[in-house]
Amino acid sequence: MAEDWRDSNIDDLCDALLVLRTRDEAAAFLRDICSLHELESLSHRWQAARLVHAGTPYARVASQLHASTATVTRVAHWLNHGEGGYRLVLERLEAQR
């Protein structure tokens, strides 16, 4: 994994995300910063991560989300071998329930 992906622009975006306080604020920011296609892609990746984390078979995830198995496999790879962001958020959401 390339270590040079994080720069001051990425950090600035992360800081912007950290000031959002509500779901509506987050939705408004995401809609302003992303095209509808980008937003749909992000939301599908997130749903794929949730389903894979829950143990749903990849083919079923792909079918349910109308995504390719390649996309689901890529999400699963990042879930298991990425920076830990998916897992961190999933665990925090589980702890809130």
Feature names for model-found ranges:
Residues 1-20:
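General nucleic-acid-binding
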Residues 4-9, 40, 52-53:
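Short acidic alpha-helix initiation/capping motifs at coil-to-helix transition points
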Residues 9-13, 29, 47, 71:
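A general alpha-helix detector
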Residues 14, 66-93:
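C-terminal structural segments of small proteins and small subunits
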Residues 18, 22, 50-53, 77-81:
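Amphipathic alpha-helical interaction elements
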Residues 25-44, 97:
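Short, Lys/Arg-enriched anionic-surface-contact patches
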Residues 42-56:
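Short, amphipathic alpha-helical "recognition" segments used to contact nucleic acids or chromatin
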Residues 60-65:
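Short alpha-helical "recognition helix" segments of helix-turn-helix
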